[in-house]
Amino acid sequence: MNNLLTLVISAALVSGAATAPNARPKVSLHSATKSEIAEDINEQLIADIEECRTELDQLAQNNTLTMKSFDNLMKETLAAYHKEKSLSKEDVLTILDGVSFATKKHDGQTRKNTEKTPYISHPLGVAVHLMEIGKVRDVNTIVAALLHDTVEDTKTELAEIEKQFGSAVAGYVKEVSDNKSLPAQERKRLQVINASHKSAVAAQIKLADKLYNLNDLLNNPPSDWTPTRIDQYFQWAKSVVDRLPPSNENLELAVQDCIDSYWASQAP
């Protein structure tokens, strides 16, 4: 068993508590033995997680941010399964299937940041925000977050998602997908107009998505984005999230804090 996965599982077994996105779990790599893990979590489930992580590691070319996001997602998932009993074994396997599906679909795509981070880091990060900050434990919401850009940005049909993950997940993905046949400015305008009509699940995914993108702009913006363009994105993002129906107070506050911090940093 690799050390990172042992750390993830140990954190889930020992604490079951969410940590700050950048905080390392304060547990020893040896705080849970393999036999204890096998008894409490299931040996085959561990093997499935390791297989998914290996696939991701290969396609993401061992990108640090991507692998950290996966490990954080697994920490939250295993805590929900083992400690909270809020996710079933089948739910964990479905989340792993979602990671694998999204990883393959986004293979070769990168973010617009200067480091050209593998794109899969984004849906993983959105799912982590839902679980860590939003305390979301609904498996369909988590999987829809993992797949939220597959229809919009890859050659994926909703029917394919429905066949593998069900109509609920496909419906949520449809709700949060833009029509890429429209010009970018029109898509942004429609996001503002349509925000108030989103379901609570779609609203939560939108909040986590915007939170990830806003933080990414602060920490690793595209090289060709001017300060004015970043300002405009923050203004537009606020227009969208302010119109979303109430859905998750923790995520709403996190997005607002991010926006407020940005404008405070821009003050003369």
Spans of features found by a protein language model:
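Active-site helical microenvironments for divalent-metal-assisted chemistry
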Residues: I37-P268
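Classical Sec-dependent N-terminal signal peptides that target proteins to the secretory pathway
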Residues: M1-A23
